[in-house]
Amino acid sequence: MPYTDVVIHEIQRLVDIVPMGVPHNIIQDTQFRGYLLPKGTDVFPLLGSVLKDPKYFRYPDAFYPQHFLDEQGRFKKNEAFVPFSSGKRICLGEAMARMELFLYFTSTLQNFSLCSLVPLVDIDITPKLSGFGNITPTYELCLVAR
């Protein structure tokens, strides 16, 4: 089920519910892009900016699962895919969250057909509110038993 994994990754990348990581504290004076960041400065990583970086994602604002496929159609890791943050402060529940997402997604699709109650062209996932978290619009979905 490599394509299922690819689709889940692309959903996480595109929807980006938590665009800001947990704060980090600079432990020594650091030069970054011509700026001095003094020791003790709090830095908030903007994960959303990485997840939509055209340097790493060919179509950053579109749903394009091929972002995570290699030429042979196999899953390909992408260093810019950091929905759970990175480094020492990565989400401790990442492995469990990935497993649960996969199981929930696959069991739902195995047992139901999904039908949108709104024409697909009218669905806009642009966040209604953005800040520490992104709040996307809600849409109704009909699950039809297979």
From Swiss-Prot:
A Pfam match: p450
InterPro entries cross-referenced by the UniProt entry: Cyt_P450, Cyt_P450_CS, Cyt_P450_E_grp-I, Cyt_P450_sf, Cytochrome_P450_fam2
Annotated GO MF terms: heme binding; iron ion binding; monooxygenase activity; oxidoreductase activity, acting on paired donors, with incorporation or reduction of molecular oxygen
Source organism superkingdom: Eukaryota
Cofactor(s) listed: heme
Keyword vocabulary terms for this entry: Heme, Iron, Metal-binding
Binding positions for heme per the UniProt entry: 91
Family designation: Belongs to the cytochrome P450 family.
Protein name (record): Putative inactive cytochrome P450 2G1
Source organism per UniProt: Homo sapiens (Human)
